A protein has these predicted regions:
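SAM-dependent methyltransferase catalytic-core segment centered on the flexible catalytic loop
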Residues: 81-163, 171, 227-252, 256, ...
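Extended, hydrophobic alpha-helical segments in both membrane/secreted and soluble proteins
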Residues: 150, 164, 176, 289-298, ...
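Short glycine/proline-rich turn/loop motifs
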Residues: 52-57, 125-137, 272-283
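Nucleic acid-processing catalytic cores of prokaryotic defense/repair systems
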Residues: 45-66, 79, 85-90, 94-102, ...
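Conserved helix-to-beta-strand junction in the class I
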Residues: 156-158, 167, 183, 301
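Conserved proline-anchored active-site loop of SAM-dependent methyltransferases
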Residues: 82-100, 180, 308-322, 331-332, ...
Length: 609
Protein backbone atom coordinates (compact mmCIF):
# COMPACT_ATOMS: atom_id res chain seq x y z
CA UNK A 1 0.00 0.00 0.00
CA UNK A 2 1.22 3.53 -0.75
CA UNK A 3 2.87 5.25 2.22
CA UNK A 4 1.13 8.50 1.23
CA UNK A 5 0.15 10.58 -1.78
CA UNK A 6 2.37 13.43 -2.96
CA UNK A 7 0.52 16.38 -4.58
CA UNK A 8 1.30 16.96 -8.25
CA UNK A 9 1.09 20.73 -7.76
CA UNK A 10 2.25 23.21 -5.16
CA UNK A 11 -0.54 25.58 -6.15
CA UNK A 12 -4.01 24.03 -6.11
CA UNK A 13 -5.37 26.72 -8.45
CA UNK A 14 -2.74 25.94 -11.10
CA UNK A 15 -3.46 22.24 -10.69
CA UNK A 16 -7.18 22.73 -11.15
CA UNK A 17 -6.54 24.83 -14.26
CA UNK A 18 -4.53 21.99 -15.77
CA UNK A 19 -7.27 19.52 -14.96
CA UNK A 20 -9.89 21.82 -16.47
CA UNK A 21 -7.76 21.97 -19.61
CA UNK A 22 -7.71 18.19 -19.63
CA UNK A 23 -11.53 18.15 -19.51
CA UNK A 24 -11.49 20.35 -22.60
CA UNK A 25 -8.93 18.08 -24.26
CA UNK A 26 -11.07 15.05 -23.53
CA UNK A 27 -14.03 16.79 -25.10
CA UNK A 28 -12.02 17.58 -28.23
CA UNK A 29 -10.65 14.04 -28.53
CA UNK A 30 -13.98 12.49 -27.56
CA UNK A 31 -12.77 9.70 -25.33
CA UNK A 32 -13.91 8.37 -21.99
CA UNK A 33 -12.99 8.14 -18.29
CA UNK A 34 -12.42 11.86 -17.79
CA UNK A 35 -13.52 11.93 -14.15
CA UNK A 36 -11.45 8.86 -13.33
CA UNK A 37 -8.10 10.36 -14.31
CA UNK A 38 -9.06 13.73 -12.85
CA UNK A 39 -9.71 12.20 -9.42
CA UNK A 40 -6.45 10.26 -9.52
CA UNK A 41 -4.42 13.38 -10.20
CA UNK A 42 -6.26 15.33 -7.51
CA UNK A 43 -5.41 12.50 -5.08
CA UNK A 44 -1.68 12.80 -5.85
CA UNK A 45 1.31 10.65 -6.77
CA UNK A 46 1.41 7.31 -4.91
CA UNK A 47 4.57 7.18 -2.80
CA UNK A 48 5.83 3.68 -1.94
CA UNK A 49 8.73 2.45 0.13
CA UNK A 50 11.97 2.00 -1.81
CA UNK A 51 14.96 -0.29 -1.36
CA UNK A 52 18.50 0.21 -2.62
CA UNK A 53 19.43 -3.25 -3.91
CA UNK A 54 22.92 -2.58 -5.28
CA UNK A 55 25.64 0.05 -5.35
CA UNK A 56 28.00 0.03 -8.34
CA UNK A 57 31.22 2.04 -8.22
CA UNK A 58 31.59 5.07 -5.96
CA UNK A 59 28.86 6.83 -3.98
CA UNK A 60 26.75 8.65 -6.57
CA UNK A 61 23.44 10.44 -7.18
CA UNK A 62 22.92 8.43 -10.38
CA UNK A 63 19.92 6.12 -10.16
CA UNK A 64 18.51 3.04 -11.85
CA UNK A 65 14.94 2.64 -10.59
CA UNK A 66 12.79 -0.41 -11.13
CA UNK A 67 9.20 0.77 -11.00
CA UNK A 68 6.56 2.70 -12.86
CA UNK A 69 7.00 6.27 -14.04
CA UNK A 70 4.40 7.73 -11.67
CA UNK A 71 5.84 5.95 -8.61
CA UNK A 72 9.40 6.97 -9.55
CA UNK A 73 8.30 10.60 -9.87
CA UNK A 74 6.67 10.40 -6.43
CA UNK A 75 10.02 9.28 -4.97
CA UNK A 76 11.89 12.12 -6.74
CA UNK A 77 9.34 14.72 -5.67
CA UNK A 78 9.35 13.55 -2.04
CA UNK A 79 13.17 13.81 -2.01
CA UNK A 80 13.23 17.23 -3.74
CA UNK A 81 15.09 15.87 -6.78
CA UNK A 82 14.53 17.96 -9.91
CA UNK A 83 15.54 16.82 -13.39
CA UNK A 84 16.94 19.17 -16.04
CA UNK A 85 16.21 17.19 -19.19
CA UNK A 86 13.76 14.40 -19.95
CA UNK A 87 13.81 12.04 -22.91
CA UNK A 88 11.11 9.39 -23.01
CA UNK A 89 10.46 6.68 -25.57
CA UNK A 90 7.15 5.27 -24.29
CA UNK A 91 5.15 2.52 -25.98
CA UNK A 92 3.80 3.74 -29.33
CA UNK A 93 0.37 2.05 -29.09
CA UNK A 94 1.52 0.10 -32.13
CA UNK A 95 -0.53 -3.03 -31.47
CA UNK A 96 2.64 -5.16 -31.35
CA UNK A 97 4.09 -7.57 -28.80
CA UNK A 98 7.81 -7.22 -28.07
CA UNK A 99 9.92 -10.24 -27.25
CA UNK A 100 13.42 -10.95 -25.99
CA UNK A 101 15.43 -13.71 -27.64
CA UNK A 102 16.85 -15.90 -24.87
CA UNK A 103 20.06 -17.67 -25.92
CA UNK A 104 21.18 -20.93 -24.35
CA UNK A 105 24.82 -20.44 -23.32
CA UNK A 106 27.56 -22.88 -24.20
CA UNK A 107 28.32 -25.61 -21.73
CA UNK A 108 31.80 -24.65 -20.39
CA UNK A 109 33.21 -28.08 -21.25
CA UNK A 110 32.05 -27.78 -24.86
CA UNK A 111 33.22 -24.17 -25.09
CA UNK A 112 36.69 -25.14 -23.90
CA UNK A 113 36.86 -27.93 -26.47
CA UNK A 114 35.97 -25.45 -29.20
CA UNK A 115 38.68 -23.08 -28.02
CA UNK A 116 41.31 -25.82 -28.14
CA UNK A 117 40.25 -26.79 -31.64
CA UNK A 118 40.36 -23.10 -32.65
CA UNK A 119 36.87 -23.39 -34.07
CA UNK A 120 34.14 -20.75 -34.10
CA UNK A 121 30.43 -21.13 -33.67
CA UNK A 122 28.24 -19.15 -36.02
CA UNK A 123 25.37 -17.27 -34.39
CA UNK A 124 22.88 -19.28 -36.45
CA UNK A 125 24.00 -22.42 -34.60
CA UNK A 126 22.96 -21.03 -31.24
CA UNK A 127 19.79 -22.39 -29.71
CA UNK A 128 17.28 -19.90 -28.40
CA UNK A 129 13.66 -19.26 -27.53
CA UNK A 130 11.63 -16.08 -27.12
CA UNK A 131 10.00 -14.55 -24.06
CA UNK A 132 7.54 -11.66 -24.09
CA UNK A 133 8.89 -8.37 -22.74
CA UNK A 134 5.78 -6.24 -23.00
CA UNK A 135 2.68 -5.83 -25.11
CA UNK A 136 2.14 -2.49 -26.85
CA UNK A 137 -1.54 -3.19 -27.34
CA UNK A 138 -3.82 -0.43 -26.07
CA UNK A 139 -7.16 1.05 -26.89
CA UNK A 140 -6.86 4.75 -27.55
CA UNK A 141 -8.74 5.85 -24.43
CA UNK A 142 -6.65 3.77 -22.02
CA UNK A 143 -3.39 4.86 -23.67
CA UNK A 144 -4.18 8.57 -23.50
CA UNK A 145 -5.35 8.33 -19.88
CA UNK A 146 -2.16 6.50 -18.98
CA UNK A 147 0.02 8.94 -20.92
CA UNK A 148 -1.64 11.99 -19.41
CA UNK A 149 -1.00 10.76 -15.87
CA UNK A 150 2.64 9.97 -16.68
CA UNK A 151 3.27 13.33 -18.34
CA UNK A 152 1.74 15.17 -15.40
CA UNK A 153 4.01 13.23 -13.04
CA UNK A 154 7.08 13.98 -15.16
CA UNK A 155 6.28 17.69 -15.34
CA UNK A 156 6.02 17.82 -11.55
CA UNK A 157 9.72 16.85 -11.16
CA UNK A 158 11.15 19.02 -13.96
CA UNK A 159 13.23 22.08 -13.06
CA UNK A 160 12.12 25.48 -14.35
CA UNK A 161 14.81 25.42 -17.08
CA UNK A 162 14.10 21.83 -18.10
CA UNK A 163 12.83 20.56 -21.43
CA UNK A 164 11.30 17.26 -22.50
CA UNK A 165 11.60 15.22 -25.69
CA UNK A 166 8.88 12.63 -26.25
CA UNK A 167 9.63 10.02 -28.93
CA UNK A 168 6.65 8.60 -30.85
CA UNK A 169 5.61 7.42 -34.28
CA UNK A 170 2.60 7.73 -36.56
CA UNK A 171 0.31 5.52 -34.47
CA UNK A 172 -0.54 7.99 -31.72
CA UNK A 173 1.70 11.09 -31.96
CA UNK A 174 -1.07 13.41 -33.22
CA UNK A 175 -3.17 12.68 -30.12
CA UNK A 176 -0.27 13.01 -27.69
CA UNK A 177 0.62 16.39 -29.21
CA UNK A 178 -2.74 17.74 -27.96
CA UNK A 179 -2.04 16.39 -24.46
CA UNK A 180 1.41 17.99 -24.50
CA UNK A 181 -0.09 21.35 -25.51
CA UNK A 182 -2.46 21.21 -22.55
CA UNK A 183 0.08 19.99 -19.98
CA UNK A 184 3.09 22.11 -20.95
CA UNK A 185 1.29 24.93 -22.78
CA UNK A 186 1.14 25.67 -26.48
CA UNK A 187 3.61 28.53 -25.98
CA UNK A 188 6.18 26.06 -24.62
CA UNK A 189 6.09 23.87 -27.71
CA UNK A 190 9.53 24.22 -29.31
CA UNK A 191 10.00 21.66 -32.09
CA UNK A 192 8.59 18.74 -33.99
CA UNK A 193 11.73 16.78 -34.84
CA UNK A 194 11.79 14.19 -37.60
CA UNK A 195 14.23 11.32 -37.15
CA UNK A 196 14.67 9.89 -40.62
CA UNK A 197 16.18 6.45 -41.23
CA UNK A 198 16.40 3.89 -44.02
CA UNK A 199 15.31 0.87 -41.98
CA UNK A 200 11.69 -0.25 -42.08
CA UNK A 201 8.89 -1.23 -44.41
CA UNK A 202 9.26 -1.87 -48.15
CA UNK A 203 5.85 -1.64 -49.81
CA UNK A 204 4.58 -0.36 -53.15
CA UNK A 205 0.97 0.48 -52.30
CA UNK A 206 1.72 3.65 -50.28
CA UNK A 207 4.58 5.86 -49.10
CA UNK A 208 6.99 3.85 -46.95
CA UNK A 209 7.13 4.92 -43.31
CA UNK A 210 10.76 5.87 -42.64
CA UNK A 211 10.71 8.26 -39.69
CA UNK A 212 9.80 8.75 -36.04
CA UNK A 213 8.56 11.99 -34.48
CA UNK A 214 9.98 13.72 -31.41
CA UNK A 215 8.13 16.60 -29.74
CA UNK A 216 10.20 19.04 -27.73
CA UNK A 217 8.57 21.17 -25.01
CA UNK A 218 10.01 23.33 -22.25
CA UNK A 219 8.79 23.72 -18.67
CA UNK A 220 9.01 27.51 -18.99
CA UNK A 221 10.39 30.17 -21.30
CA UNK A 222 13.77 29.94 -19.52
CA UNK A 223 14.85 26.61 -20.98
CA UNK A 224 18.45 25.56 -21.65
CA UNK A 225 19.54 25.15 -25.28
CA UNK A 226 23.02 25.45 -26.83
CA UNK A 227 23.03 25.04 -30.62
CA UNK A 228 26.82 25.45 -30.79
CA UNK A 229 27.19 21.99 -29.23
CA UNK A 230 25.48 20.32 -32.19
CA UNK A 231 26.60 22.29 -35.25
CA UNK A 232 26.44 20.21 -38.41
CA UNK A 233 29.36 19.95 -40.80
CA UNK A 234 28.57 20.54 -44.46
CA UNK A 235 30.64 20.81 -47.61
CA UNK A 236 30.10 23.88 -49.78
CA UNK A 237 31.91 25.25 -52.81
CA UNK A 238 34.27 28.23 -52.68
CA UNK A 239 31.85 30.37 -54.69
CA UNK A 240 28.98 29.59 -52.34
CA UNK A 241 31.24 30.19 -49.36
CA UNK A 242 32.21 33.63 -50.64
CA UNK A 243 28.60 34.49 -51.45
CA UNK A 244 27.13 33.42 -48.10
CA UNK A 245 30.01 34.17 -45.75
CA UNK A 246 28.32 35.11 -42.48
CA UNK A 247 24.77 35.34 -43.80
CA UNK A 248 21.84 33.10 -42.96
CA UNK A 249 22.42 29.92 -41.03
CA UNK A 250 25.99 29.39 -42.17
CA UNK A 251 28.83 29.87 -39.69
CA UNK A 252 32.34 29.95 -41.10
CA UNK A 253 34.89 27.81 -39.28
CA UNK A 254 38.13 29.82 -39.28
CA UNK A 255 40.35 26.95 -38.17
CA UNK A 256 43.07 26.09 -40.67
CA UNK A 257 43.04 22.77 -42.42
CA UNK A 258 39.28 22.46 -42.56
CA UNK A 259 39.22 22.89 -46.35
CA UNK A 260 35.68 23.15 -47.61
CA UNK A 261 34.08 21.96 -44.36
CA UNK A 262 31.54 24.42 -42.95
CA UNK A 263 29.34 24.23 -39.89
CA UNK A 264 25.65 25.03 -39.90
CA UNK A 265 22.99 25.43 -37.25
CA UNK A 266 21.05 22.18 -36.85
CA UNK A 267 17.60 21.69 -38.36
CA UNK A 268 14.61 19.69 -37.14
CA UNK A 269 15.15 16.86 -39.63
CA UNK A 270 17.78 14.40 -38.41
CA UNK A 271 19.35 11.74 -40.61
CA UNK A 272 20.73 9.25 -38.09
CA UNK A 273 21.23 5.59 -38.92
CA UNK A 274 19.54 2.90 -36.86
CA UNK A 275 21.75 0.37 -35.07
CA UNK A 276 23.12 -2.34 -37.32
CA UNK A 277 23.60 -5.90 -36.14
CA UNK A 278 27.39 -5.57 -35.78
CA UNK A 279 27.44 -2.23 -33.91
CA UNK A 280 29.47 -2.26 -30.69
CA UNK A 281 26.69 -0.37 -28.89
CA UNK A 282 24.09 -3.06 -29.67
CA UNK A 283 22.73 -4.75 -26.54
CA UNK A 284 20.05 -7.05 -28.02
CA UNK A 285 17.13 -4.94 -26.81
CA UNK A 286 14.25 -4.83 -29.26
CA UNK A 287 13.44 -1.10 -28.95
CA UNK A 288 17.04 0.13 -28.62
CA UNK A 289 17.73 3.61 -30.05
CA UNK A 290 21.15 4.76 -31.37
CA UNK A 291 23.51 6.64 -29.08
CA UNK A 292 23.96 9.33 -31.76
CA UNK A 293 20.30 10.31 -31.38
CA UNK A 294 20.60 10.84 -27.63
CA UNK A 295 24.00 12.49 -27.94
CA UNK A 296 22.48 15.26 -30.06
CA UNK A 297 19.61 15.81 -27.61
CA UNK A 298 21.73 15.78 -24.46
CA UNK A 299 24.50 18.00 -25.87
CA UNK A 300 22.03 20.66 -27.02
CA UNK A 301 19.60 20.65 -24.10
CA UNK A 302 21.81 20.18 -21.04
CA UNK A 303 25.12 21.18 -19.51
CA UNK A 304 27.62 19.13 -17.52
CA UNK A 305 26.39 17.84 -14.14
CA UNK A 306 22.74 18.40 -15.04
CA UNK A 307 20.34 15.52 -14.31
CA UNK A 308 19.02 13.65 -17.36
CA UNK A 309 16.00 11.38 -16.83
CA UNK A 310 14.38 8.65 -18.89
CA UNK A 311 11.24 7.18 -17.31
CA UNK A 312 10.78 4.48 -19.97
CA UNK A 313 14.46 3.67 -20.03
CA UNK A 314 14.48 0.50 -22.13
CA UNK A 315 18.00 -0.34 -23.27
CA UNK A 316 19.59 2.37 -21.11
CA UNK A 317 20.83 4.49 -24.00
CA UNK A 318 19.88 7.78 -22.29
CA UNK A 319 21.75 6.93 -19.08
CA UNK A 320 24.76 5.61 -21.02
CA UNK A 321 25.13 8.73 -23.19
CA UNK A 322 24.44 11.06 -20.26
CA UNK A 323 27.25 9.40 -18.30
CA UNK A 324 29.61 9.58 -21.31
CA UNK A 325 28.93 13.32 -21.59
CA UNK A 326 29.50 14.08 -17.90
CA UNK A 327 25.86 14.40 -16.89
CA UNK A 328 23.99 12.74 -14.04
CA UNK A 329 21.28 10.24 -14.94
CA UNK A 330 18.06 8.66 -13.72
CA UNK A 331 16.92 5.53 -15.53
CA UNK A 332 13.48 4.14 -14.75
CA UNK A 333 11.66 1.12 -16.14
CA UNK A 334 9.22 -1.49 -14.88
CA UNK A 335 10.84 -4.46 -16.68
CA UNK A 336 13.67 -6.47 -15.13
CA UNK A 337 15.23 -6.94 -18.57
CA UNK A 338 15.63 -3.17 -18.90
CA UNK A 339 17.10 -2.82 -15.41
CA UNK A 340 19.64 -5.61 -15.93
CA UNK A 341 20.58 -4.54 -19.46
CA UNK A 342 21.16 -0.96 -18.31
CA UNK A 343 23.00 -2.00 -15.17
CA UNK A 344 25.42 -4.17 -17.16
CA UNK A 345 25.82 -1.52 -19.86
CA UNK A 346 26.67 1.21 -17.36
CA UNK A 347 29.06 -1.03 -15.43
CA UNK A 348 30.98 -1.68 -18.66
CA UNK A 349 31.08 2.09 -19.18
CA UNK A 350 32.64 2.60 -15.74
CA UNK A 351 29.66 4.50 -14.33
CA UNK A 352 28.80 4.78 -10.63
CA UNK A 353 25.15 4.44 -9.60
CA UNK A 354 22.58 2.94 -7.24
CA UNK A 355 19.98 0.36 -8.24
CA UNK A 356 16.65 0.90 -6.49
CA UNK A 357 13.44 -1.09 -6.30
CA UNK A 358 10.07 0.56 -5.66
CA UNK A 359 8.10 -1.66 -3.27
CA UNK A 360 4.71 -1.11 -4.84
CA UNK A 361 3.28 -4.45 -3.74
CA UNK A 362 3.82 -6.25 -7.03
CA UNK A 363 6.33 -9.10 -7.09
CA UNK A 364 6.74 -9.05 -10.85
CA UNK A 365 7.52 -12.22 -12.73
CA UNK A 366 10.31 -10.71 -14.90
CA UNK A 367 8.02 -8.09 -16.48
CA UNK A 368 4.33 -7.07 -16.55
CA UNK A 369 3.27 -9.05 -19.62
CA UNK A 370 4.77 -12.31 -18.34
CA UNK A 371 3.24 -11.68 -14.92
CA UNK A 372 -0.19 -11.28 -16.50
CA UNK A 373 0.26 -14.58 -18.34
CA UNK A 374 1.37 -16.23 -15.09
CA UNK A 375 -1.61 -14.89 -13.14
CA UNK A 376 -4.06 -16.34 -15.65
CA UNK A 377 -2.52 -19.78 -15.16
CA UNK A 378 -2.59 -19.49 -11.34
CA UNK A 379 -6.26 -18.53 -10.94
CA UNK A 380 -7.87 -21.94 -10.79
CA UNK A 381 -10.51 -22.50 -13.46
CA UNK A 382 -10.15 -19.09 -15.10
CA UNK A 383 -11.08 -19.15 -18.77
CA UNK A 384 -12.23 -16.76 -21.46
CA UNK A 385 -15.97 -16.14 -21.50
CA UNK A 386 -17.78 -14.55 -24.45
CA UNK A 387 -20.82 -13.57 -22.38
CA UNK A 388 -18.87 -11.00 -20.32
CA UNK A 389 -17.20 -7.79 -21.55
CA UNK A 390 -13.45 -7.34 -21.91
CA UNK A 391 -13.44 -5.44 -18.59
CA UNK A 392 -13.37 -8.93 -17.03
CA UNK A 393 -10.32 -11.15 -17.45
CA UNK A 394 -12.68 -14.10 -17.85
CA UNK A 395 -14.79 -16.24 -15.55
CA UNK A 396 -14.70 -19.32 -13.34
CA UNK A 397 -17.48 -21.87 -12.82
CA UNK A 398 -18.84 -22.27 -9.29
CA UNK A 399 -20.76 -25.48 -8.54
CA UNK A 400 -23.47 -23.54 -6.65
CA UNK A 401 -23.45 -20.07 -8.23
CA UNK A 402 -22.62 -20.94 -11.83
CA UNK A 403 -20.57 -18.44 -13.87
CA UNK A 404 -18.47 -16.01 -11.77
CA UNK A 405 -16.77 -13.16 -13.72
CA UNK A 406 -13.22 -12.31 -12.57
CA UNK A 407 -11.54 -8.89 -12.75
CA UNK A 408 -7.73 -8.75 -12.72
CA UNK A 409 -5.87 -5.39 -12.77
CA UNK A 410 -3.75 -4.86 -15.85
CA UNK A 411 -0.13 -4.62 -14.67
CA UNK A 412 0.77 -2.77 -17.88
CA UNK A 413 -1.64 0.05 -16.96
CA UNK A 414 -0.69 1.77 -13.70
CA UNK A 415 -4.15 3.35 -13.40
CA UNK A 416 -5.64 -0.05 -12.50
CA UNK A 417 -3.15 -0.89 -9.74
CA UNK A 418 -5.05 0.76 -6.89
CA UNK A 419 -8.55 -0.37 -5.90
CA UNK A 420 -10.13 2.92 -4.90
CA UNK A 421 -13.58 4.49 -4.96
CA UNK A 422 -13.12 5.47 -8.61
CA UNK A 423 -12.43 1.89 -9.71
CA UNK A 424 -15.08 0.18 -7.54
CA UNK A 425 -17.61 2.76 -8.75
CA UNK A 426 -16.74 1.74 -12.31
CA UNK A 427 -17.31 -1.91 -11.37
CA UNK A 428 -20.71 -1.18 -9.78
CA UNK A 429 -22.12 1.31 -12.26
CA UNK A 430 -20.56 0.28 -15.57
CA UNK A 431 -19.27 -3.31 -15.52
CA UNK A 432 -21.89 -5.12 -13.39
CA UNK A 433 -24.99 -3.66 -15.15
CA UNK A 434 -23.71 -5.16 -18.43
CA UNK A 435 -23.58 -8.69 -16.97
CA UNK A 436 -26.33 -11.25 -17.65
CA UNK A 437 -29.07 -11.28 -14.97
CA UNK A 438 -28.21 -14.82 -13.85
CA UNK A 439 -24.75 -13.75 -12.57
CA UNK A 440 -24.82 -13.90 -8.74
CA UNK A 441 -21.19 -13.15 -7.86
CA UNK A 442 -18.06 -11.43 -9.19
CA UNK A 443 -14.45 -11.61 -7.98
CA UNK A 444 -12.31 -8.46 -7.92
CA UNK A 445 -8.55 -8.92 -7.56
CA UNK A 446 -6.49 -5.95 -6.42
CA UNK A 447 -2.81 -5.13 -5.99
CA UNK A 448 -3.21 -2.15 -3.67
CA UNK A 449 -6.30 -0.84 -1.87
CA UNK A 450 -7.01 2.51 -0.24
CA UNK A 451 -8.99 1.08 2.69
CA UNK A 452 -10.86 -2.22 2.56
CA UNK A 453 -13.57 -1.07 5.00
CA UNK A 454 -14.16 2.09 2.99
CA UNK A 455 -14.49 0.05 -0.21
CA UNK A 456 -16.90 -2.45 1.40
CA UNK A 457 -19.01 0.39 2.84
CA UNK A 458 -19.20 1.99 -0.60
CA UNK A 459 -20.30 -1.35 -2.11
CA UNK A 460 -23.10 -1.75 0.46
CA UNK A 461 -24.36 1.79 -0.13
CA UNK A 462 -24.22 1.77 -3.93
CA UNK A 463 -24.74 -1.77 -5.21
CA UNK A 464 -28.12 -1.73 -6.90
CA UNK A 465 -28.71 -5.43 -7.62
CA UNK A 466 -28.40 -8.67 -5.71
CA UNK A 467 -24.87 -9.73 -6.52
CA UNK A 468 -21.91 -10.57 -4.29
CA UNK A 469 -18.60 -8.74 -4.81
CA UNK A 470 -15.64 -10.66 -3.37
CA UNK A 471 -12.36 -8.76 -2.99
CA UNK A 472 -9.12 -10.76 -3.25
CA UNK A 473 -5.48 -9.70 -2.82
CA UNK A 474 -3.51 -10.51 -5.99
CA UNK A 475 -0.21 -10.47 -4.08
CA UNK A 476 -1.15 -13.75 -2.41
CA UNK A 477 -1.11 -15.39 -5.84
CA UNK A 478 2.02 -13.60 -7.04
CA UNK A 479 3.97 -14.71 -3.98
CA UNK A 480 3.63 -18.27 -5.21
CA UNK A 481 5.28 -17.55 -8.57
CA UNK A 482 8.85 -17.05 -7.35
CA UNK A 483 10.86 -20.24 -6.96
CA UNK A 484 14.59 -19.77 -6.39
CA UNK A 485 16.98 -21.49 -8.76
CA UNK A 486 19.11 -24.26 -7.26
CA UNK A 487 22.90 -23.86 -7.18
CA UNK A 488 25.60 -26.36 -6.24
CA UNK A 489 29.28 -25.39 -6.07
CA UNK A 490 32.55 -26.08 -4.33
CA UNK A 491 35.52 -23.89 -3.48
CA UNK A 492 39.11 -24.68 -4.42
CA UNK A 493 41.85 -22.23 -3.48
CA UNK A 494 40.67 -18.81 -4.76
CA UNK A 495 37.99 -20.10 -7.12
CA UNK A 496 34.33 -21.02 -6.85
CA UNK A 497 33.57 -23.90 -9.20
CA UNK A 498 29.95 -24.24 -10.28
CA UNK A 499 28.92 -27.91 -10.22
CA UNK A 500 25.28 -27.61 -11.23
CA UNK A 501 22.51 -25.08 -11.76
CA UNK A 502 18.81 -25.88 -11.97
CA UNK A 503 16.17 -23.35 -13.02
CA UNK A 504 12.73 -24.94 -13.01
CA UNK A 505 11.19 -21.89 -14.70
CA UNK A 506 13.52 -22.03 -17.66
CA UNK A 507 13.27 -25.80 -17.97
CA UNK A 508 9.49 -25.44 -18.12
CA UNK A 509 9.84 -22.75 -20.79
CA UNK A 510 12.19 -24.93 -22.83
CA UNK A 511 9.83 -27.89 -22.54
CA UNK A 512 6.99 -25.70 -23.85
CA UNK A 513 9.21 -24.61 -26.74
CA UNK A 514 10.14 -28.21 -27.56
CA UNK A 515 6.48 -29.28 -27.58
CA UNK A 516 5.75 -26.44 -29.97
CA UNK A 517 8.57 -27.56 -32.26
CA UNK A 518 7.29 -31.15 -32.21
CA UNK A 519 3.79 -29.97 -33.10
CA UNK A 520 5.18 -28.00 -36.05
CA UNK A 521 7.10 -31.09 -37.17
CA UNK A 522 3.89 -33.13 -37.21
CA UNK A 523 2.13 -30.49 -39.32
CA UNK A 524 4.96 -29.36 -41.61
CA UNK A 525 7.54 -32.12 -41.42
CA UNK A 526 11.28 -31.47 -41.51
CA UNK A 527 13.90 -31.68 -38.77
CA UNK A 528 12.86 -31.17 -35.16
CA UNK A 529 14.99 -28.42 -33.58
CA UNK A 530 14.57 -29.17 -29.89
CA UNK A 531 16.67 -27.67 -27.11
CA UNK A 532 18.49 -30.06 -24.80
CA UNK A 533 20.08 -29.01 -21.53
CA UNK A 534 23.00 -30.84 -19.93
CA UNK A 535 22.69 -32.52 -16.56
CA UNK A 536 24.83 -29.78 -14.98
CA UNK A 537 22.67 -26.99 -16.47
CA UNK A 538 25.55 -24.48 -16.62
CA UNK A 539 24.38 -23.24 -20.02
CA UNK A 540 21.43 -21.58 -18.23
CA UNK A 541 23.72 -19.09 -16.45
CA UNK A 542 24.18 -15.54 -17.79
CA UNK A 543 26.00 -13.82 -14.93
CA UNK A 544 27.76 -14.64 -11.66
CA UNK A 545 28.55 -11.99 -9.06
CA UNK A 546 30.35 -12.24 -5.71
CA UNK A 547 29.75 -9.90 -2.78
CA UNK A 548 32.89 -9.85 -0.63
CA UNK A 549 31.73 -6.83 1.37
CA UNK A 550 28.50 -7.82 3.10
CA UNK A 551 26.46 -10.96 3.72
CA UNK A 552 23.13 -9.08 3.70
CA UNK A 553 21.47 -5.88 2.51
CA UNK A 554 22.72 -3.81 -0.42
CA UNK A 555 24.64 -5.84 -3.00
CA UNK A 556 28.28 -5.01 -3.82
CA UNK A 557 29.57 -6.75 -6.93
CA UNK A 558 33.22 -7.19 -5.96
CA UNK A 559 33.86 -9.92 -8.54
CA UNK A 560 31.70 -10.50 -11.59
CA UNK A 561 31.60 -12.39 -14.86
CA UNK A 562 28.94 -12.16 -17.55
CA UNK A 563 28.67 -14.82 -20.25
CA UNK A 564 27.53 -13.70 -23.71
CA UNK A 565 25.57 -15.83 -26.15
CA UNK A 566 28.75 -17.17 -27.74
CA UNK A 567 30.24 -18.23 -24.42
CA UNK A 568 32.76 -15.36 -24.08
CA UNK A 569 32.97 -13.55 -20.76
CA UNK A 570 32.99 -9.95 -19.62
CA UNK A 571 35.03 -9.86 -16.42
CA UNK A 572 34.35 -7.01 -13.97
CA UNK A 573 33.01 -4.88 -16.82
CA UNK A 574 35.84 -5.64 -19.27
CA UNK A 575 35.10 -7.70 -22.38
CA UNK A 576 37.46 -10.59 -23.08
CA UNK A 577 37.95 -13.28 -25.70
CA UNK A 578 37.98 -15.99 -23.06
CA UNK A 579 35.37 -18.71 -22.85
CA UNK A 580 33.75 -19.30 -19.48
CA UNK A 581 35.34 -22.27 -17.75
CA UNK A 582 32.62 -22.83 -15.15
CA UNK A 583 34.50 -20.93 -12.43
CA UNK A 584 34.79 -17.48 -10.89
CA UNK A 585 37.92 -16.23 -9.14
CA UNK A 586 38.07 -14.06 -6.02
CA UNK A 587 40.69 -12.14 -4.04
CA UNK A 588 38.79 -11.32 -0.85
CA UNK A 589 36.71 -13.94 0.94
CA UNK A 590 33.29 -14.08 -0.78
CA UNK A 591 30.24 -13.84 1.48
CA UNK A 592 27.40 -14.15 -1.05
CA UNK A 593 27.00 -15.32 -4.63
CA UNK A 594 24.37 -14.03 -7.05
CA UNK A 595 23.40 -16.03 -10.14
CA UNK A 596 21.41 -14.53 -13.02
CA UNK A 597 19.87 -17.05 -15.36
CA UNK A 598 19.46 -16.47 -19.10
CA UNK A 599 15.90 -15.17 -18.64
CA UNK A 600 17.01 -12.52 -16.16
CA UNK A 601 15.93 -14.10 -12.86
CA UNK A 602 18.45 -13.56 -10.07
CA UNK A 603 18.95 -15.67 -6.96
CA UNK A 604 21.28 -14.95 -4.04
CA UNK A 605 22.98 -17.64 -1.96
CA UNK A 606 25.04 -17.30 1.23
CA UNK A 607 28.49 -18.84 0.74
CA UNK A 608 29.53 -21.42 3.29
CA UNK A 609 33.26 -22.07 3.41
Amino acid sequence: MAVKYVPYFKDAIQGQALLDNFVRTKRILKYADNNEIKERIERGLPLYETEVTEIVGKESDNLIIRGECVSACAYLKENNIKVDLVYIDPPFASGADYAKTVYIRRNPKIAEAIKKAEEKFEIEELKSFEEKMYGDIWNKEAYLNWMYENLMAIKSVMSETASIYIHLDWHICHYVKILMDEIFGEDNFLNEIIWSYSWGSRIETQWNKKHDTLYMYSKSEKFYFDAKEVLEERKISESTKNRLKYKGAMITDRNKGRGDQEKALPTDVWYIATINGMATEKVDYSTQKPEALLERIIKASSDSNMIIADFFGGSGVTAKVANDLGRKFIHCDIGINSIETTRDRLKRAGASFKVMDIKDGVNLYRNPVQTMDKIKSLISGLKNEDSVSEFWEGAVNDSKLGLVPVYVPNLMDSTTKLLDIVLINKVINLAIPELPDEIKKVIIYYIDIIDKKEINDFIKENLGREIEIELRDLKEILSETVIDDILEYHILDNEIIIDSFISERIIKKINEYNEKMKAQFIVKGGKIKCIEISEEGLELIEMISLDCTSDKGIWHSDEEIKIDKLGYITENGVKTKNFWNGKIKFVKKPLRIKIRNISGDESIHIIEI
